[in-house]
Design a protein with these regions (language model features):
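Substrate-binding groove of N-acetylhexosamine-processing glycoside hydrolases
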Residues: 2-274
Length: 274
């Protein structure tokens, strides 16, 4: 028994479930398994946590799509590799329920990490709604309305970037540092960094934006500038800008919130009606 999933260090619940499946010949009852998982991971499973997971199961974990990405990650809707994210109202309610467990679980670092992640998805979905409206207004020639929606999307995404800066895994800084560590000279380090950044962005040809990494640093310094460029007079220079970004050494400028958990809760409340 084993598993070889594409994309590691994410979605821990799936790895835990697969590992447990290796120890039984019977099917696993998720209604009873998930509360045990939550207690093991966070130290408790309040009623709101159980309700949150019911919503996650009915939405994000009940669907499987190729190329799951937000529209702002591809600049324009991808008509070649059509996909979607199941971030319905039920999913968003699940995030709100998850965050409501903070009072009893805030001492758990794993709860804080997951709260940051879920809140970031919540906010990114709100930003996506704004960005889609910006694209629509732009297509209708409503420049002022388009820029208003673009600015709102960018505002939300900057908060997402700052929130993810506190996550131990979802940071471009970690990726770039690991790549540069392989080089022995500055030239080698720059080459390894460029290759690492290409892998998570343009990739090459048909598979552009394949990775769609949801990372601090990448949102602030790659996705947001790309969005702004698309809505500027330099739209035709998008490919050149991407290549220049890949080849230029990157320096982290993202900062984190002093209290990421409480910031996550406040940001979700702030953008709830977006």
């Amino acid at each position: 028994f084993g598993s070889a999933l594409e994309g590691l260090e994410n979605n821990e619940v799936i790895y835990e479930l697969l590992a447990d499946m290796g120890w039984t010949a019977d099917s696993i009852d998720l209604d009873s398994w998930l509360p045990v998982y939550c207690k093991a991971r966070y130290g408790g499973c309040p009623a709101a946590m159980d309700s949150a997971w019911q919503r996650f199961r009915e939405t994000a974990y009940s669907s499987l799509y190729s190329y799951p990405r937000f529209t702002w990650q591809t600049v324009v809707p991808d008509t070649r590799r059509i996909s979607k994210l199941d971030v319905s109202d039920s999913f968003l309610q699940g995030v709100e329920l998850f965050l409501s467990c903070a009072d009893s679980l805030e001492s758990s670092s794993l709860f804080v990490n997951d709260a940051i992640e879920y809140a970031s998805y919540y906010l990114a979905a709100k930003a996506d709604d704004c960005y889609k409206r910006a694209l629509k207004e732009d297509s209708l020639g409503n420049r002022v309305a388009a820029m208003q929606q673009l600015d709102r999307s960018v505002e939300i995404l900057l908060d997402v970037d700052k929130l993810l800066a506190s996550h131990p895994l979802y940071r471009l800084e970690e990726w770039v540092d690991m790549a540069r560590d392989w080089g022995k000279t500055d030239l080698e380090k720059d080459a390894y960094e460029a290759n690492a950044k290409r892998l998570i962005t343009t990739w090459g040809g048909f598979q552009e934006d394949y990775a769609a990494r949801f990372w601090s640093g990448l949102i602030k310094d790659y996705y947001i500038p790309r969005m702004k460029l698309y809505f500027s007079e330099q739209r035709a220079d998008l490919n050149r800008w991407e290549e220049n970004w890949i080849k230029a050494p990157w320096h982290n400028t993202s900062t984190s919130f002093e209290d990421p958990l409480q910031s996550a809760i406040k940001l979700v409340e702030r953008y709830k009606e977006e």
